[in-house]
Amino acid sequence: MPLHHLTRFPRLELIGAPTPLEYLPRLSDYLGREIYIKRDDVTPIAMGGNKLRKLEFLVADALREGADTLITAGAIQSNHVRQTVAVAAKLGLHCVALLENPIGTTAENYLTNGNRLLLDLFNTQIEMCDALTDPDAQLQTLATRIEAQGFRPYVIPVGGSSALGAMGYVESALEIAQQCAEVVGLSSVVVASGSAGTHAGLAVGLEHLMPDVELIGVTVSRSVAEQKPRVISLQQAIAGQLALTATADIHLWDDYFAPGYGVPNDAGMEAVKLLASLEGVLLDPVYTGKAMAGLIDGISQKRFNDDGPILFIHTGGAPALFAYHPHV
C-alpha cells in the first residue's frame, strides 16, 4: 500500500501512540468466539474517542489556513463535538457548536449532563437549531456569520467525516495490521457506521492491508439503502486522494439501530451492561452499544463469513452514559 501518499496531508499529533488492541477473554468465553477490541475510547483528550484520529488531519488543515475558530455540528450529546471543542481549547482556538436535539426529549440529564456538560467546561459557544436538516449548508451559513464578527472560521463537518478526516482511519487500519501481524489472524472487524468516515477509512485501509478480513458496519441511524451510498462516496473520495483503487464491497447491518438515532434500545443496553460486567469496558447507548449488539447477534445468527477471531472497534462515547440515565 503506498502509504507515502498519507504524508502529503498535514497532521497534528494528538494521540501520540497506537491505541491498545486487547483480547477480551471473558466475553470470548461467553460468546464462544475469540473477540478482540481496538481501544480508540482511550485516546488522550477529553475522555477519548475515535474523532481525534480525524481531527489530527482536519485541525492541521485549519491551522495551515490560519483559522482561529473551529465550527462544527451535531446532537446535544455528540461525541464528535466534545472532542472537537476540547482540541480547540487545547490549542487556544475559539469553537462554535451548532447543536440539535434529535430525540426531542426534555429530560434534564440529556439536555445538561454527559457530553453537553463538558461543552460548557471547554468554554464552547453554543448555537441551537431545530434540526440539522442540511448540516453542510447550515454550517456554512454559521461560518459566514462568525466571519462577519471578525473571526477566521474553519468548518469541520458532522462527525469529522470528510475524505480528509477519514485519513485518520486509513492510518488506523495500518495500526491494526501492524498490531495483528503474526499474532492474530483476524476474520472480521465490526464498527459502528454513522457519519461514515470511520467506516470508509477502514474500508480503504483494510482492503489494501488485510484484504481477506471482512469489515461489517453496524448502522446507528440509517437503513442500508440510505447508509451504503454515503460510505461508498467517502470510500471513493479517500481512495482518489491516495491514488488507490477501492473495489471492496461495503457490508452493512441495519437491524440494530431502531427505534432511531440516539434512542437506546434493549439489545444495545444489554450489550453495554454485558461489556461492563464481563470486561470492565464502557460502551455507550448510541453507537458502540448498538454495534456490539450487532456483533453478538451476528455470532448467534451465524452472519459472519466464518468462525474466526473478530475485532470490535471501540469508538468511545462513554460520557453519554450519564446523559441517558435512568435508561442505563
From Swiss-Prot:
Name a Pfam family for this protein. Answer: PALP
Give the top-rank taxon of the lineage listed in the UniProt record for this protein: Bacteria
Q: Which GO terms describe its molecular function?
A: D-cysteine desulfhydrase activity
Enzyme Commission number, as recorded: 4.4.1.15
Q: Per its UniProt record, what SUPFAM superfamilies does this chain match?
A: Tryptophan synthase beta subunit-like PLP-dependent enzymes (SSF53686)
List the cofactors: pyridoxal 5'-phosphate
Q: Which residues cross the membrane?
A: none
Q: Which GO terms describe its biological process?
A: D-amino acid metabolic process
According to UniProt, the reaction catalysed is: D-cysteine + H2O = hydrogen sulfide + pyruvate + NH4(+) + H(+)
Residues recorded as bearing N6-(pyridoxal phosphate)lysine in the entry: 51
Per UniProt, the keywords (alphabetical) are: Lyase, Pyridoxal phosphate
Does the keyword Lyase belong to this entry?
Answer: yes
Q: What is this protein's function?
A: Catalyzes the alpha,beta-elimination reaction of D-cysteine and of several D-cysteine derivatives. It could be a defense mechanism against D-cysteine.
* Assembly and binders: Homodimer.
Q: Say which family it is in.
A: Belongs to the ACC deaminase/D-cysteine desulfhydrase family.
Protein name (database record): D-cysteine desulfhydrase
The organism encoding this protein is: Salmonella paratyphi C (strain RKS4594)
